Amino acid sequence: MKPFVIAIDGPAASGKGTLARKIATHYHLHYLDTGLTYRGVAHALLQQKLALDDEKNALVYARELDFNTLNPALLSSHELGNAASKIAIIPTVRETLVAKQRNFAKILPGSVLDGRDIGTIVCPDADVKLYVLANVQIRAKRRYQEILKKGAQADYHEILVNLEQRDSRDITRKQSPLKQAKDAYLLDTSELSIEATFTVACALIDPIIKARIIG
C-alpha cells in the first residue's frame, strides 16, 4: 500500500499551517510542519550561542533532529521564524532535513506536509498539491492580530517589512526556492476564512482519495 501524501506550500502567514492541520485531522493522516524542522535547528544553534551561518554545527543538529520532539509552542516565535529562513539557505542542512521529511512522508496511511518546497522538491509525486497564498498586507495583518491575541506587543509595519524580506529570501534562494508546482491547485486565502478555504480544499481532495480507493 502506498501512503497518501498531500503537499501544501506557500509563503509565511498564508494560512497553510492551519489548513494543513485541519486536513490532516479530517482525513486521519500524519502531519508535519516542515518549517519546524528548520526552526528546530535554529533553536539548537541559538541555545548554544552559535552563529546561524555555522554550517558545521547546523549540519550536526540537522542530523540529530528528532521530528517527534518538535514543539510548536517552543518554536513558533517571530524571531525563530526569521532565524529558520536563514538556516534554510544552507545547502547541506536543507539536503539533510529534506531526506528526513521524505522518510516521514513514507509513513502509512499517509501524511500532510506543509512548507515552501513540498510539492516541488520534498514530495514531487504527492497525490495532492496545494499552493496557498494571500496578499502580503493581509498576511501581515493576520500575523499582527495573532501576536496581539497572545498578549504580546506588535508593530504592523515591522511585521509587513519582515514578511516581505522573508518572501524575498524564500523566492530567490538558489536551492529549493518557494514556487508553485506546475500541478498544484492554487488557493488564494486573501478573502477566504479558514473554514471556506478548508471546504474548497476538501472538494479538491475528496475525488482524488475516492479514485485511489476505487483504483
From Swiss-Prot:
Asked whether the UniProt record includes Kinase among its keywords, one would answer: yes
Q: Where in the cell is it found?
A: Cytoplasm
Give one Pfam family. Cytidylate_kin
List, in alphabetical order, the Gene Ontology terms for molecular function in this entry.
Answer: ATP binding; CMP kinase activity; dCMP kinase activity
Stored Gene3D superfamilies? P-loop containing nucleotide triphosphate hydrolases
Location, primary (coarse class): cytoplasm
Q: Which InterPro entries match?
A: Cytidylate_kin, Cytidylate_kinase_dom, P-loop_NTPase
Q: Which UniProt keywords apply?
A: ATP-binding, Cytoplasm, Kinase, Nucleotide-binding, Transferase
Which E.C. number(s) belong to this protein?
2.7.4.25
Q: In the UniProt record, does the keyword Nucleotide-binding occur?
A: yes
GO cellular component terms given for this protein = cytoplasm
| GO biological-process terms attached to the record | pyrimidine nucleotide metabolic process
Question: What HAMAP family does the record point to?
Answer: Cytidyl_kinase_type1
The UniProt family comment states: Belongs to the cytidylate kinase family. Type 1 subfamily.
The name on file for this protein is Cytidylate kinase
UniProt source species:
Bartonella henselae (strain ATCC 49882 / DSM 28221 / CCUG 30454 / Houston 1)
Instruction: Name the encoding gene, please.
Output: cmk
